[in-house]
Amino acid sequence: MGLGAAARSAAQSFDRIAADYDRLGDLSENDGIMGWLVSVLPSVGGRALDLGCGAGRHAVLLAERFAHVDAIDLSLPMIEIARARRSRPNVAYRQADLLAATGSGEYDLVLSVMTLHHVPDLQAALAHIRGLLAPGGRIVLVDAYPAESAHPARRILHLLVPLRPRLHAGAVLRFRANLARRGPATAWEIYRLSIRKEWLDHRVSDRFSSREELDQCCATLFPGCQLERLGGTVVGLTWDRTL
């Protein structure tokens, strides 16, 4: 099945930064997210699905726990990096849109990390993800959800200051933090990659849903789910489907 227009646009954006994306992951892997995933993923299972797998960083974690892992991503260069760097005998990487993922009720685990802010309709995406889960299975989702309505000053700032300068300023702040945490060489490389035109172009295309939107979706699709703040606006969600 071919990609739709929105999916093609997102794929092209990722295609241009695939190597940088993977390198940044090597340099600045979010230990908070990875540590949380290790704590909430089942220790063993049958079939798992990684939606928006990127270069396979989380698929290899699933491969240690599940008999088979399907890992999909919009970007073919990302998939090629995953196959080259993180191939596992029980992981099948393929290019596909999240909304085109098939296997209704087949998966014991469905995982998505920092992918949902690229979908045009959060409710539709979450409903589709729920449909992929087998009875007794678990959904684990991670993404950023700014609470815009609680911060009117932030909305004013966003109106007055264009996104690109704000992203550049954020890279400077992270550089300062990384100097102490990772040393000058690594801090400089992270900063250099973060201010490249292709990377900033990609970041400008991000469209984050609000925390309020997430809460509304969870009330109807994932009643009783667990939500945990993992740092800043990043939220981890777990939900178990009853038998």
Enumerate the language-model features and the residues they cover.
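Short alpha-helix
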Residues: S205-P223
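A short glycine-rich, Lys/Arg-flanked "PGG" loop and its adjoining helix->strand segment in the class I
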Residues: A124-P135
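A conserved beta-strand element that flanks and buttresses the S-adenosyl-L-methionine
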Residues: L111
